[in-house]
Regions:
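Short, well-ordered beta-strand elements
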Residues: 33-44, 67-70
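N-terminal export signals
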Residues: 5-25
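Short helix-initiation/N-cap motifs at beta->coil->alpha
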Residues: 63-80
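Short helices/loops that flank or line small-molecule/ion binding pockets
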Residues: 52, 75-90
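A bilobed periplasmic-binding-protein/Venus flytrap-type ligand-binding module shared by bacterial periplasmic
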Residues: 40, 118-136, 165
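A ligand-binding cleft/hinge motif common to bilobed small-molecule-binding domains
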Residues: 88-109
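An extracytoplasmic/periplasmic, membrane-proximal ligand-sensing/linker region
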Residues: 149-184
Length: 184
């Protein structure tokens, strides 16, 4: 009888280990940690086009980043992915980014998310969570600035680079600030 309990326990343990190996969540965790995933809301065509163009720039300029675009179903899903720490970099309209930072409607159910600005692109901001390392943020801004002319003029407006205006309501990431101070 003791032998049966041991065999059941071993069988259950083996099954649990085998099933755990097929969890898509672990694969997603590894996937997103080995790539720069630029998140955009599928409901905002401009942000999708910007994220797509920026992902291509980062893939060329920073090949080790393995940059890709990911589309969230809508802006609220985008905010949830960033707030939960699943993804770190996104393209948002400035008003939306400010609402996320303040924990205001329509994103209040996610609480306040400590977003930081990397760059301004037309009416949109490229934002990240404040935990993004300073050197990584610097490299992203530098790459974006160096290849600014590759972005569609209709997307960037009259801006000559990604430097945000002084009136920005979402603070700059320290790595971005360092880049802009050295390249004024």
């Amino acid at each position: 009888m003791h032998r049966r309990k041991c065999l059941r326990l071993l069988g259950a343990t083996g099954a649990a280990l085998l099933l755990a190996g097929h969890s898509p969540y672990r694969q997603w965790d590894v996937y997103r940690k080995t790539r720069l995933v630029l998140l955009a809301s599928a409901t905002d065509e401009t942000s999708v086009r910007l994220a797509q163009a920026l992902a291509a720039i980062f893939a060329r300029q920073l090949p080790d980043s393995r940059a890709i675009l990911a589309r969230a179903r809508d802006t609220n899903d985008l905010v949830r992915l960033v707030a939960s720490g699943q993804l770190e970099v996104a393209i948002l309209r400035e008003g939306e980014a400010h609402a996320v930072l303040m924990g205001a409607e329509p994103f209040a159910d996610n609480g306040s998310v400590a977003l930081r600005t990397l760059g301004a692109i037309g009416d949109h901001l490229m934002v990240c969570v404040e935990e993004v390392p300073k050197p990584a943020a610097y490299l992203l801004v530098e790459s974006m600035a160096e290849r600014w002319h590759d972005l569609d003029a209709a997307l960037v407006g009259r801006a000559s680079g990604p430097r945000p205006p002084q009136s920005l309501r979402v603070p700059l990431h320290p790595g971005a600030l360092e880049y802009y101070r050295g390249h004024s």
